[in-house]
Amino acid sequence: MVKEAVKIVAQNKKARHDYFIEETIEAGIVLSGTEVKSVRQGKLNLKESYASIVEGEVIVSGMHISPYEQGNIFNKDPLRDRKLLLHKSEINRLIGLTQQKGYTLVPVQAYLKRGMVKIELGVARGKKLYDKRDDIAARDAKREIDRKMKEQLR
């Protein structure tokens, strides 16, 4: 079985740092032609982006796609809201999940799959400061253990 080629264009590392990602879902995105060309060049930033559900549609706000150099009049506003493509049942499930206290939708990564731009949306719960410190401590401990194991194997 041939594995599909997926090219990751952008990741939202801040989302993984600030939130617990409970569940992820893949969604298509509505883009203009020059925006697709810009995304293929990797000129996409998810750092300050978030998703919301408005009138039964999932909208991504704050996602920055740099204007395409040769796009001139066809370029759109880099920070405009963009619609995500999901089935109605998926949107209804997301509505149910995000209505719980403390949950939100955050774009985790953007990638190209079979020539199409896809967004991985995460149903996320905010981290407290002590949760972030625990993650940093666990990461440092794992790094120290790996270092000791490497020294023992020499």
Swiss-Prot record:
It comes from the Bacteria. Keywords: Cytoplasm, RNA-binding. Its main location: cytoplasm. GO terms for biological process: trans-translation. The keyword Cytoplasm applies. The keyword DNA damage does not apply. InterPro entries: SmpB, SsrA-bd_prot, SsrA-bd_prot_CS. One of its GO terms (cellular component) is cytosol. One of its GO terms (molecular function) is RNA binding. It is found in: Cytoplasm. Pfam families: SmpB. Belongs to the SmpB family. HAMAP family: SmpB (MF_00023). Required for rescue of stalled ribosomes mediated by trans-translation. Binds to transfer-messenger RNA (tmRNA), required for stable association of tmRNA with ribosomes. tmRNA and SmpB together mimic tRNA shape, replacing the anticodon stem-loop with SmpB. tmRNA is encoded by the ssrA gene; the 2 termini fold to resemble tRNA(Ala) and it encodes a 'tag peptide', a short internal open reading frame. During trans-translation Ala-aminoacylated tmRNA acts like a tRNA, entering the A-site of stalled ribosomes, displacing the stalled mRNA. This is SsrA-binding protein. It comes from Ruminiclostridium cellulolyticum (strain ATCC 35319 / DSM 5812 / JCM 6584 / H10). The lineage of its organism: Bacteria, Bacillati, Bacillota, Clostridia, Eubacteriales.
